[in-house]
Amino acid sequence: MASLQRKGLQARILTSEEEEKLKRDQTLVSDFKQQKLEQEAQKNWDLFYKRNSTNFFKDRHWTTREFEELRSCREFEDQKLTMLEAGCGVGNCLFPLLEEDPNIFAYACDFSPRAIEYVKQNPLYDTERCKVFQCDLTKDDLLDHVPPESVDVVMLIFVLSAVHPDKMHLVLQNIYKVLKPGKSVLFRDYGLYDHAMLRFKASSKLGENFYVRQDGTRSYFFTDDFLAQLFMDTGYEEVVNEYVFRETVNKKEGLCVPRVFLQSKFLKPPKNPSPVVLGLDPKS
């Protein structure tokens, strides 16, 4: 297996067969079933972690390589960095970062209570280095666990796609409150026409670019325009917002799997300093 990666500002171009498949698969899941999926979202993710334990996702050692922000946001090399991983799963991103960088303190939360238990059972879990808690980012206030405007960087990695599109802005509003002015959200998630999107069977579609898996968990596939609008409507500024195209090639079987992700960086605007009025005595 080999992987070839490139970045771009335009969505992937479909083959004629892929276009035909998407045109055929237009039937939406019933409103009743959609409401049931929303009500049972936490239960379905908890069952996912019960089935897969900590074995489903690989540890993400690419994070610091892909997101230079984790290094560049420091003024000096051993400066302490406070981060929030919103949607940490079982710690596949969290623990490699803590292991690689001794000067990181991390807040980490997840929708699934079972995932949080797996994080706390990890041998690398250290309460001096991280605070981990269960949280539904669409309704639980992060300020109950994280001081306001105390976080240097927020990691939002393959998380927002699992949230209903109507509630995504609530997640962004929530993390906005704990992020320092002038600091960033680092985002990576599924992009439009990713291989996973094209593999969904008929009757899996919930809405535009939104699908349900057989286990009841859901996935949204982002366009750069949709994501940019979502962040900017919540008060962030766009810094980087680009597609990552990755082809996984299996020469032995003659397969080429096109993966598409969106990798982005959005900034919470810095606070404007108080205007200085010339010619006035500040004591008067």
Curated annotation (Swiss-Prot):
Localization: Cytoplasm; Nucleus
Annotated positions binding S-adenosyl-L-methionine: 45, 49, 87, 110, 136-137, 157
An example molecular function term from Gene Ontology annotations: tRNA (cytidine-3-)-methyltransferase activity
Major localization listed first in the record, in broad terms: cytoplasm
GO biological process: tRNA methylation; tRNA modification
Gene Ontology CC: cytoplasm; nucleus
Function of the protein: S-adenosyl-L-methionine-dependent methyltransferase that mediates N(3)-methylcytidine modification of residue 32 of the tRNA anticodon loop of tRNA(Ser), including tRNA(Ser)(UGA) and tRNA(Ser)(GCU). Interaction with SARS1/SerRS is required for N(3)-methylcytidine methylation.
Name used for this protein in its record: tRNA N(3)-cytidine methyltransferase METTL6
Source organism: Homo sapiens
Gene that this polypeptide is encoded by: METTL6
